[in-house]
């Protein structure tokens, strides 16, 4: 939590064009205190958090790395809540099988499912014997993940978080993500992916899927609040210093919204090799 808070204070301050001195003046404290917050040496007093959040133009929840409350539910919050059963079904992605072959659970390995949706892949990993954590911005998605895990007789540490605000503090053997990178604000990509890479254990795996833009493919019909597809091949370059087990680009048909459309995607399996 300390690392997340430190990064958020620094980021939101810079987004406002404030110096450490400027923020300190707003709070009637010394700039040295702000500097210590941003380096993680100390944390703000709890009583000061509301004033700090106000000065930075965010909620206390967002400052602490939790998703802020939304007046308008996200597209998938509504989809998951109103689905008859599970919006994406309960059959795991083929990517799960590839991960299983690359790093089987011969010992208790830790997995983080980033943007887990309704939990079908997270629950699959738990059933295979992995120690699984998973997060999503959708309340309904998190609750359905927990329900699916209960039904399968396994445990998934499912929690709510916003991919743009949440930063890893624990280390994992496998980072897994399908179709969520497009929600990362472009100006935050470098920082977020660097944070992810720094929290993968040696010999660990990153298994990532990202939508990419193509001039010959129309934008998807889903009205997502944040949709920032990557450039073709961009995902691979973030892991140029890891061993690339496999990477590919493909185009596929989709009818998730009830309207037939196509997507282009890049898929990456990279191993942290020291």
Regions found by a protein language model. Name each.
Residues 14, 25, 54:
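Alpha-helical residues within the helix-turn-helix
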Residues 47-62:
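DNA major-groove recognition helix of helix-turn-helix/homeodomain DNA-binding modules
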Residues 176:
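A conserved beta-strand element that flanks and buttresses the S-adenosyl-L-methionine
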Residues 1-15:
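A short, Lys/Arg-rich alpha-helix, primarily the initiator
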Residues 67-107, 111-170, 184-191, 195, ...:
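Class I (Rossmann-like) S-adenosyl-L-methionine-dependent methyltransferase catalytic domain
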Residues 179-183:
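Short catalytic micro-motifs in class I SAM-dependent methyltransferases
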Residues 17-36:
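Short alpha-helical DNA-recognition segment
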């Amino acid at each position: 939590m300390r690392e997340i808070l430190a990064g958020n204070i620094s980021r939101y301050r810079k987004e406002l064009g404030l110096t450490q001195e400027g923020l300190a003046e707003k709070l009637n404290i010394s700039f040295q205190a702000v500097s210590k917050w941003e380096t993680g040496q100390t944390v703000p007093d709890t009583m000061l958090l509301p004033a700090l959040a106000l000065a930075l133009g965010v909620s206390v929840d967002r400052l602490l790395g939790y998703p802020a409350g939304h007046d308008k539910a996200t597209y998938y919050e509504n989809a998951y809540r109103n689905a008859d059963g599970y919006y994406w079904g309960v059959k795991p992605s083929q990517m799960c099988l590839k991960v299983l072959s690359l790093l089987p659970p011969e010992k208790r390995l830790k997995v983080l499912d980033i943007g887990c949706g309704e939990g079908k892949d997270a629950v699959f990993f738990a059933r295979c014997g992995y120690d699984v954590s998973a997060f999503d911005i959708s309340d309904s998605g998190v609750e359905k993940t927990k329900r699916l895990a209960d039904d399968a007789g396994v445990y998934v540490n499912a929690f709510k978080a916003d991919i743009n605000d949440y930063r890893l503090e624990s280390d994992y053997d496998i980072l897994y993500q399908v179709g969520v990178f497009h929600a990362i604000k472009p100006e935050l990509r470098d920082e977020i992916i660097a944070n992810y890479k720094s929290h993968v254990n040696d010999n660990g795996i990153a298994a990532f899927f990202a939508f990419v833009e193509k001039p010959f493919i129309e934008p998807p019909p889903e009205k997502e609040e944040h949709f920032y597809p990557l450039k073709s091949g961009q995902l691979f370059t973030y892991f140029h210093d890891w061993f690339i087990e496999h990477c590919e680009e493909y185009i596929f048909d989709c009818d998730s919204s009830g309207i037939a459309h196509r997507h282009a995607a890049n898929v990456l399996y990279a191993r942290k090799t020291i």
